Amino acid sequence: MTKKEKKSFNQSLAEWKRFIYNPTSGEFLGRTAKSWGLILLFYLVFYGFLAALFTFTMWVMLQTLNDEVPKYRDQIPSPGLMVFPKPLSALEYTFSASDPSSYRGYIEDLRKFLKPYTLEEQKNLTVCPDGILSEQKGPVYVACQFPIFLLQACSGMSDPDFGYSQGSPCVLVKMNRIIGLKPEGTPRIECIPKDENVASISTYPNNGIIDLKYFPYYGKKLHVGYLQPLVAAQVIFSANSTKKEVTVECKIDGSPNLKNQDDRDKFLGRVAFKIIARA
């Protein structure tokens, strides 16, 4: 058996040049111009067809969607609750009344959140009658004013520090928006401390009432300028208690069609947070 002769560098280079372009057959990278043209035409037609099919499919799907109201919505009829300011970790507010830097972030978050609720921002909103649903047929949907003074000590008007500098912090609670929701009865948000010997809770508006005039909600695109009703919970620690740590639970109450308890979702209609006031 004879060993295969090793090709010289010049021979290998010549073969590569011939592969890239063969002047005898006119081939480029092993294919003639006609062959390359047919391949490019095939892929152009093939991917053009796929793009057209995708575009047509998307167009058909978009025809089934409403531009103003989502076609598919959460099947849970009751809203959850959210709190502000945003806690730094695990729904826990830790601060020291004697150290402004410890609660500065909370105050800034509250001011930013309440900016749309100022009188100047609400001047184009409607003064709606209290106690009745604001059902509307369109095409123009009005948004009701939410007087910020209803939050009283937690409005930021009389106390720009929202009680944190006094050791009595405010936390705002709101319901999540659900399009078309019509609460029955007299909905309110009730906030209670786990240990009543440590602290008491003052809620604003009085009794945590949520006025029916803010319902139903018609969606972000239709209901321009809509403001969600708020309830403020102010934690007031007992002067006789040396412990300045309490867990507060807020839940929706007073409305038969709004749930605050569900076996599959323990947070439905309720929220719990902890307040820790350090010396």
UniProtKB/Swiss-Prot annotation:
It is found in: Apical cell membrane; Basolateral cell membrane; Melanosome. It is a single-pass type II membrane protein. It comes from the Eukaryota. The chain crosses the membrane at residues 36-56. PROSITE patterns: ATPASE_NA_K_BETA_1. Keywords: Cell membrane, Disulfide bond, Glycoprotein, Ion transport, Membrane, Potassium, Potassium transport, Signal-anchor, Sodium, Sodium transport, Sodium/potassium transport, Transmembrane, Transmembrane helix, Transport. The keyword Lipid metabolism does not apply. Gene3D superfamilies: Na, k-atpase alpha subunit. The keyword Transmembrane helix applies. Disulfide bonds join C128-C144, C154-C170, C191-C250. The C-terminal lobe folds into an immunoglobulin-like domain and may mediate cell adhesion properties. The sodium/potassium-transporting ATPase is composed of a catalytic alpha subunit, an auxiliary non-catalytic beta subunit and an additional regulatory subunit. Interacts with catalytic alpha subunit ATP12A. This is Sodium/potassium-transporting ATPase subunit beta-3. It comes from Oryctolagus cuniculus.
